[in-house]
Regions:
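Membrane-interface "cap" regions at the ends of multi-pass membrane proteins
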Residues: 1-29, 58-63, 67-80, 84-89, ...
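Select transmembrane alpha-helical segments in multipass membrane proteins
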Residues: 7-18, 43-46, 85-99, 147-153, ...
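Helix-loop-helix connectors at the membrane interface of multi-pass transporters/channels
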Residues: 5, 75, 109-141, 245-249, ...
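Loop-to-transmembrane helix boundary motifs in multi-pass membrane proteins
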Residues: 7, 13-15, 21, 147-148, ...
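Membrane-embedded translocation segments of transport machinery
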Residues: 4-8, 170, 174-322, 326, ...
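Transmembrane helix-boundary motif of multi-pass solute transporters/channels
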Residues: 13-50, 237-243, 253-257, 261-262
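Inter-helical loop and helix-membrane interface segments of multi-pass membrane transporters/permeases
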Residues: 2-6, 34-38, 68-93, 106-166, ...
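C-terminal membrane-solvent junction of multi-pass transporters and transport-like membrane proteins
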Residues: 90-95, 340-352, 384-444
Length: 458
């Protein structure tokens, strides 16, 4: 039976959905920290350049494959490749990549909700630094707490996706993303009035090449390149699915620019929130979970109206994580529908059970299944799963999309250019072809190789 392809109701819906997928916790727990380490404004400048020459082109390619095929990532290549070609094998890998990402992202989204709840009801109020750190350890040690929030995330997200594309996912994500952007602005304005704001902002935004040389110029360039590449979550078809839901009114380069601008806005605004607070309370900038769950809660505990600001911050973090979960769930559910021909409701129900089961190792990896053998990856099941997605699926997947679009062995430059340029807006030009065909693939291979080197040999 031929199912009518669902479409998104509005252009804003498409842009916010795609941005929601790209905007994740990395924008907050990674970007400000490595920007501060890498020389502030100097790093930010390189980051922006890499976004334009690295992230942006690959995003247009993923969208083009989705929009031209009108299929989920698992079937998109089949619609576009020439007879006898094997590109569609990557379609199955995009689906595996999506499952792998959700195996740990649902847990991390659960952490955000748990902390929103704890802050909102005042469980972190009046604690000293050690007690705050203790709360995080306590959460990781409790399979029950983490399972509850993880299941909550999965159930809510599946219910939203099961309702349908326009009435479920698009409506909810639109509201969530607008709320996220507004909350960020309120938090940033609050930070800008703190006593340490001036110091914090100059550390974050004024180019400091001396600091950059301390870390090493090459290291800074590579981390700017990595961050620009990984922030957009390209390579597992998460963007491609939304390309398949839109019309041909606007060129894909123009739409991609808007999405990248939103992603960057969130990353930079996160720095505007975090640095003034750290400098005001004389706390070292940290990154990763310790920034979100230890450093910042300590600051909120000492701040006037800290409960309000802390609650708003964790609500924003929960939205950033949930928008990614919703986007990837949509992809998984749609792939399931196309592979089996079942309804949206049925695919949602099966995936509800499947994703909860697949997410359990990550939850248990911090307590009952903690095993020293994972130390090489960083120490927990989550780190192994994160390594597989970030170091294998994203760079290699992006490379496949890239080669598929620019080489004559795939879909080919002319087909890609025609699709990406259909509609009003910025166009991909022929002069870009040499760079996209010969230089960009080498950069992606470098990112892939460097990631492995960094993990196992550095």
């Amino acid at each position: 039976r031929i199912m009518e392809r669902e479409t998104l109701k509005s252009r804003l819906g498409f842009i916010l959905l795609s941005a929601g997928c790209a905007i994740g916790i990395g924008n907050v727990w990674k970007f400000p920290y490595i920007a501060g380490q890498g020389g502030g404004g100097a790093f930010v400048l390189f980051y922006l350049i890499f976004l334009v020459i690295l992230g942006l082109p690959i995003m247009t390619m993923e969208f083009a494959v989705g929009r031209a095929s009108r299929k989920s990532p698992v079937r998109a290549y089949q619609a576009l490749e020439k007879p006898g070609q094997k590109w569609h094998i990557h379609g199955y890998f995009t689906l595996i990549g999506c499952y792998l990402l959700m195996m740990f992202y649902t847990t991390v989204a659960g952490w955000m909700l748990h902390y929103f709840y704890m802050t909102a009801v005042g469980k972190l109020a009046g604690l000293n630094a050690e007690q705050v750190a203790g709360k995080f350890t306590e959460m990781l040690a409790s399979p029950a707490t983490m399972t509850f929030w993880m299941v909550f995330v999965v159930v809510v997200s599946i219910l939203v996706c099961a309702k349908g594309l326009q009435s479920g996912l698009e409506r909810v994500t639109k509201g969530m993303m607008i709320a996220l952007l507004l909350i960020m602005v309120v938090l940033a304005v609050n930070s800008l009035f703190m006593p340490g704001a001036k110091e914090g902002l100059s550390f974050f935004l004024v180019p400091d090449f001396a600091r950059m040389q301390e870390v090493g110029v090459v290291n800074t360039l590579v981390s700017a390149m990595n961050q620009a590449f990984f922030t957009l979550s390209l390579g597992i078809g998460a963007m491609s699915i939304f390309g398949s839901y839109i019309g041909k009114e606007h060129s894909l380069l123009g739409e991609s620019v808007r999405i990248v601008v939103l992603d960057t806005f969130v990353a930079i605004t996160a720095g505007l929130i975090i640095f003034p607070a750290c400098f005001t309370y004389h706390v070292d900038q940290t990154s990763g979970p310790s920034l979100i769950f230890i450093t910042l809660p300590n600051i909120f505990a000492n701040m006037s109206m800290g409960r309000l600001w802390g609650s708003l911050f964790f609500l924003f973090m929960a939205f950033a994580a949930m928008s990614t979960v919703l986007a990837v769930f949509e992809n998984i559910i749609c792939c399931g529908m196309e592979l089996t021909g079942c309804s949206r409701k049925k695919s949602s129900l099966v995936n509800l059970v499947l994703i909860i089961l697949l997410s359990m190792p990550c939850v248990l990896g911090y307590n009952l299944w903690a095993w020293d053998g994972f130390a090489v990856f960083g120490g927990a099941v989550l780190d192994v799963e994160d390594f597989l997605v970030s170091n294998l699926f994203l760079p290699l997947g992006s490379l496949v999309y890239l080669l598929f679009c620019v080489t004559r062995y795939g879909w080919g430059w002319q087909n890609y250019k025609k699709e990406v340029n259909t509609g009003k807006g910025l166009k991909v030009q022929d002069w870009m072809r040499g760079y996209l065909t010969y230089v960009l693939p080498l950069i992606v291979v470098f990112i892939f190789a460097f990631g492995l080197y960094d993990k196992f040999l550095a």
